């Protein structure tokens, strides 16, 4: 475990990430917390090792995490257990005054350990609902929303969902999405990107697809059907389809 020097001059905040979308969405929030709080960044490693995520930290100019849990297990239950166990060890060491999490992946379940330790939980992207318990994230988001101290929603619809479920209005704040700040901050870098040239593409003349959900890619038959559909789309519109291959899909 890392050696950490703890001071008392600023509020001590822990932010936990575990997936690449979380890293992207929180990139500017992390920068602000680094400036104004005593901030510790934790990566669960729930899906892949740090090296597979390192490109995102480098591209987004985010510092390396202070802690890396390496929580990936042989199945979802083992991973969730590891996430909670390792988070509790880190919370015991750091004694944070607040926890920030975003979204509904298994990394958000560190909130269970935080709740046990009475650490205030701030949950960004709260209140999203699909009303389908076959979706693992639907279970996660219901748990996390209901144990968080402050739920930060992207929309009025998400806020209404939480109110209907009985959460107090004074614990729900509509903030909007952090992607506005992310896109504004990186717009020059995006504009100067050479990716289209590298892939021999013309702007607005291609389809971009990313598929990683287990219900789409874990079944060879369903994945084959998806690929066949993409081929039909490409042939119909005479445009290439670029598939951003998620490690889960590649495997």
PLM region descriptions:
Residues 47-63:
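N-terminal beta-loop-helix "entrance" segment that forms/cooperates
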Residues 1-46:
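N-terminal subdomain of nucleotide-sugar transferases
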Residues 239-251:
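Catalytic donor nucleotide-activated moiety binding site of glycosyltransferases and closely related
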Residues 15, 41-43, 101, 123, ...:
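Structural beta-sheet core signal
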Residues 13-23, 212-224:
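Short, glycine-rich nucleotide/cofactor-binding loops
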Residues 46-51, 70, 147-222:
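A nucleotide-sugar donor-handling region in carbohydrate enzymes
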């Amino acid at each position: 475990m890392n050696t950490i020097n703890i001071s008392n001059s600023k509020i001590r905040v822990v932010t936990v990430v575990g997936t690449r979308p979380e890293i992207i969405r929180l990139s500017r929030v992390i920068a602000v917390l680094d400036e104004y709080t005593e901030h510790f960044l934790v990566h669960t490693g729930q899906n892949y090792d740090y090296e597979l995520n390192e490109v995102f930290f480098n591209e987004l100019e985010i510092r390396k995490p202070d802690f890396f849990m390496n929580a990936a297990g042989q199945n979802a239950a083992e991973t969730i257990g590891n996430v909670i166990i390792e988070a509790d060890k880190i919370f015991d060491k750091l004694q944070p005054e607040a926890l920030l999490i975003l979204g509904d992946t298994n990394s958000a379940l560190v909130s269970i350990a935080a709740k046990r330790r009475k650490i205030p939980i701030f949950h960004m992207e709260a209140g999203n609902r699909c009303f389908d318990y076959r979706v693992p994230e639907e279970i996660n988001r219901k748990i996390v929303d209901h144990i968080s101290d402050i739920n930060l929603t992207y929309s009025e619809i998400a806020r209404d969902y939480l109110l209907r479920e009985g959460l107090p209005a004074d614990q729900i704040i509509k903030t909007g999405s952090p992607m506005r700040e992310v896109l504004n901050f990186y717009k020059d870098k995006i504009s100067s990107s050479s990716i289209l040239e590298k892939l021999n593409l013309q702007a607005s003349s291609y389809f971009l697809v990313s598929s990683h959900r287990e219900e789409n890619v874990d079944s060879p038959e369903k994945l084959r059907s998806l690929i066949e559909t993409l081929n039909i789309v490409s042939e119909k519109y005479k445009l290439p389809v670029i598939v951003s291959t998620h490690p889960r899909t590649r495997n």
